[in-house]
Amino acid sequence: MSSPLRILAVDVGTGTQDILLFESGKTIENCFKMVMPSPTVIVAERIKRATERGRPLLLTGVTMGGGPCHWAARDHALAGFAVAVTAEAGRTFDDDLAMVEQMGFEIIEDAEAARRVENPALLHIELQDFDAQAIVTALRAFDVDPGVDALAIAAFDHGAAPPGYSDRRFRFDFIAKTVQREPVPSAFAYLAQEIPASLTRLQAIAESTARYLQLSGSDSQAPLLLMDTGSAAALGALEDPLVRGQGDSLLCNIGNFHTLAFHLVRGRIEGIFEHHTGEITRAQLEDMLVKLADGTLTNEEVFTTSGHGALVLRQSRLNAKTFPFLAVTGPRRALLRGSALHPYEATPQGGDMMLAGCYGLLRALADHEPEMAPMIEPSLLA
């Protein structure tokens, strides 16, 4: 009897990081899972405690997701306390290090950081979106073998925009080019060697995974897949049999920080938009979904309301009978609960909406590593 296939899937969000240890041959319900605070939230809380105590900060590591940790570090500097950061870690706060210096941060060389680590008066925090030590320790604490045959990780990556290029425009321009080239959600997934150079956050995560493979005793050459988190959640929602059976559907992932919606016709993307969840009301979201469905939503309409953008590949003639099936997922999905658009709250195989991104990662890995598909798909489709 062959050994089961074991995959660690991690969906790194702004509020939580959702972790699934998949093992072929098990029902998906019996695979071990954790929903824990996101890396940026963990770092933010550590910084806030340093601010309360007036301790200077030393930030090293790699580029990671911003949001809460960005705001906490900014507030620490504004309170008059020192923030020293290495260049790679500094790009967490802005791709342009001159802008990081304008925030009041000191950019230092790695050698200088290594010297300052010895100072007990400061708080040293290593920035990273994938904390291999924490995950391995957590699994072993429950006598779970952390060894895996593959890793699949999702995160939101604005991309490294050139100076003067809006992060929002850069992000959506990349999305639009991807959809025009390959209009399917799994196009936003990449094997490690194929990650676009501009996706520096995903590149940094890929570098961090080597430590997990080492600590867990896994093969150092184990396949690694990286994916955009909103697309992973949408792909995971398709593991709900009712959603998968729709020929014409809207998939809307309402995350803690970003909302991403696809218009899919027979599995192919007809339109897409992305916005900041905190910047939109239910009425605005409903209006954008209707316009996405009929093909009249414009890029500028989304961008000028502080969103990222929209792309429509084909217009449709809609009426009450032909409006697409609307499936909603994400931790903020209650924004559409009770809507006149009659949203269906997608529940992927296994019954856990918070693991939708992890299920999407498994599906994407099966697409990108076809030899693994026969061991992944039976659990997803059970």
Language-model features, listed with the residues they occupy:
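Short beta-strand scaffold segments in enzyme catalytic cores
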Residues: 17-21, 259-263
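Extended hydrophobic-aromatic, low-complexity segments
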Residues: 260-263, 270-274, 281-282
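A broad structural signal for short, well-ordered beta-strand segments within beta-sheet-rich domains
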Residues: 80, 258, 268-270, 323
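Nucleotide/phosphate-binding catalytic cleft detector across ATP-hydrolyzing
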Residues: 1-8, 12-14, 22-249, 275-282, ...
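Short acidic-glycine loop/turn motifs at beta-strand connectors
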Residues: 23-25, 264-268
